[in-house]
Amino acid sequence: MSPGRIVTVVAAVALIGAGLVFALTRGDDSGGPDGASGDAIVVDMVVSPEKERLLAPLVDEINGGGVEAAGRPVRVEMAVVSSGEATERIVAGEIEPAIWSPASSLWGRLLNYRADRALAPDESPSLVKTPLVIAMPEPFARALGWPDEPIGWSTLIAEARSERGWAAYGHPEWGPFKFGQTNPEFSTSGLSATVAEYLAAAGKREGLTLADVRAPKNRRVVRDLQRSVVHYGDTTLFFAEQMAARGPTYVSAVAME
């Protein structure tokens, strides 16, 4: 058993719609993508960074394929913007894409909440689905009973609340339980992890409501887990690099894509 080996111990959120496509509703009478450059109808499209290589060839194909609407050529202009940043800029009116492809459907719901109006539809097609998981150093996972015993969010919450930390499992040298997740304001994995934490606190697997988030009991549970966060990284790659460089005691578990 290598102390440096990282294992996936639990699916945090079953699937993230990483290829989601939203056709955004405009607040004016434009009715859609009709910004003109010369004679062309320009369709402004914003995509999250992980899909740039997937969608760029499709954009080139459309732009070079002679697509027309109402007798005018159509040109797609694609901008690459992280989902969290795009959410903020759309709400602020800094960008008005006709098409938005964030890293998760959660961003569309958050956009509508922050804008206080339905800019993104409730249902949109998803091109790709990827899991969000909890990763742990293998010795830590085995100390919790993995793989014979399942490790879930309730396990992590209990460990975060424990005053004894890893000493309760015969490993005081590992120190307290330390959790890692990315910033939910900007990162998809961080946002998804926070939603999963509230679902666990509410005793649900899906169907999180605003009442669940506002419930004092659930907020206390999530707060206790968040207090164990060692660092809010910008990306999950940061945690992977730190775990490799600093060893297993840097963090006990990380929510990762």
Language-model features, listed with the residues they occupy:
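Helix-boundary/low-complexity linker signature
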Residues: 1, 25-26, 36-39
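Short, low-complexity patches enriched in S/T/P/G
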Residues: 1-7
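Hydrophobic alpha-helical membrane-insertion segments, chiefly the h-region
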Residues: 7-9, 13-25
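N-terminal segment of the mature folded domain
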Residues: 31-175, 183-186
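A short secondary-structure junction signal
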Residues: 146-147, 190-195, 208-209
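Polar helix-capping/helix-linker motif
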Residues: 162, 187, 212-216
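Extracytoplasmic/periplasmic solute-binding protein
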Residues: 170-202
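Ligand-binding pocket segment of bilobal, Venus flytrap-like solute-binding proteins
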Residues: 196-257
